[in-house]
Amino acid sequence: MKHGIYYSYWEHEWSAKFGPYIEKVAKLGFDIIEVAAHHINEYSDAELATIRKSAKDNGIILTAGIGPSKTKNLSSEDAAVRAAGKAFFERTLSNVAKLDIHTIGGALHSYWPIDYSQPVDKAGDYARGVEGINGIADFANDLGINLCIEVLNRFENHVLNTAAEGVAFVKDVGKNNVKVMLDTFHMNIEEDSFGDAIRTAGPLLGHFHTGESNRRVPGKGRMPWHEIGLALRDINYTGAVIMEPFVKTGGTIGSDIKVWRDLSGGADIAKMDEDARNALAFSRFVLGG
């Protein structure tokens, strides 16, 4: 099991350059840094090569996360939008591969954040999402990339809200490189049992995000971490565990995540680094790795 952190913990904008954080997370003791793929197509090949070299030099693994926009929605009723989504993913995955990234997770099957001002079609979006992921899975597989479909809470998406729904979706896609992604923040809202949800995902669990119920770093809240760790051990999970804390207001990140108050206790960068280091030690202790 490898432990990582989403670079957005320190940032306010999804478009922020993530390269400078590689050395930081290495010094803090992490194995992985997860980066947002939203703007990766804006990077030049030279920039991508520099980032890849930095990761290798610092012994850091890169993973990626993404919440596609509404105009790139693979489950849209509009065939033109679905086609735009497929083209977007093929370009994005090609650039992700240039960073030697082998895992990308998020609402790949849909878009994020969902617009609930209009009625949603869960069954239709599910079926189109299966078709859409099926349509990019082989392309991703040829690049050595696993697609990890994130199960989100009801307030952020309607298609997949539980581990059981995620498993059914992945089985319907039927591709070996398409996996389930779980996140303790979302599980806290939707699942009756963390342990049961993880065991339901079982061997299909390809990526795992952690955080407290209010998005603080692990160890600063009330999540049943020992239950979570036991379940991960029960299924012999050896993948990435990525903490995804959001504790600062402001910017597109604060707005999209709905962080309306400072959850860091007024922490400066040094204190945020310390909190991340302590959360890593806590995570290794309770979850393993």
Curated annotation (Swiss-Prot):
Cofactor binding mode, per the note? Binds 1 Mn(2+) or Co(2+) ion per subunit.
The keyword Magnesium is assigned to this record:
no
* Keyword Manganese in record: yes
Query: What are the record keywords, sorted?
Result: Cobalt, Isomerase, Manganese, Metal-binding
InterPro entries under this entry? IolE/XylAMocC-like, Xyl_isomerase-like_sf, Xyl_isomerase-like_TIM-brl
**One protein family per Pfam:** AP_endonuc_2
Activity regulation: the record says: Inhibited by Zn(2+) and Cu(2+).
Q: Which residues bind substrate?
A: 6, 107, 156, 183-186, 215
What's the cofactor? Answer: Mn(2+); Co(2+)
**Family matches, as SUPFAM superfamilies:** Xylose isomerase-like (SSF51658)
EC numbers: 5.1.3.30
Output the Gene Ontology terms for molecular function.
cobalt ion binding; manganese ion binding; racemase and epimerase activity, acting on carbohydrates and derivatives
- Give a brief account of the activity's temperature dependence: Optimum temperature is 50 degrees Celsius. The activity of D-psicose 3-epimerase is very stable below 45 degrees Celsius but decreases above 50 degrees Celsius with increasing reaction time.
UniProt-annotated binding residues for Mn(2+): 150, 183, 209, 244
Q: Where is the active site?
A: 150 (proton donor/acceptor), 244 (proton donor/acceptor)
Reaction(s) this enzyme catalyzes, per UniProt: D-allulose = keto-D-fructose
Q: Which family does it belong to?
A: Belongs to the hyi family.
Give the multimer and partner information. Homotetramer.
Query: Main role?
Result: Involved in the biosynthesis of D-psicose. Catalyzes the reversible epimerization of D-fructose at the C3 position to yield D-psicose. The enzyme is highly specific for D-psicose and shows very low activity with D-tagatose. The substrate specificity decreases in the following order: D-fructose, D-tagatose, D-ribulose, D-xylulose, and D-sorbose. It shows a higher level of activity for cis ketoses than for trans-ketoses.
What is the designated name of this protein?
D-psicose 3-epimerase
Q: What is the lineage of its organism?
A: Bacteria, Pseudomonadati, Pseudomonadota, Alphaproteobacteria, Hyphomicrobiales
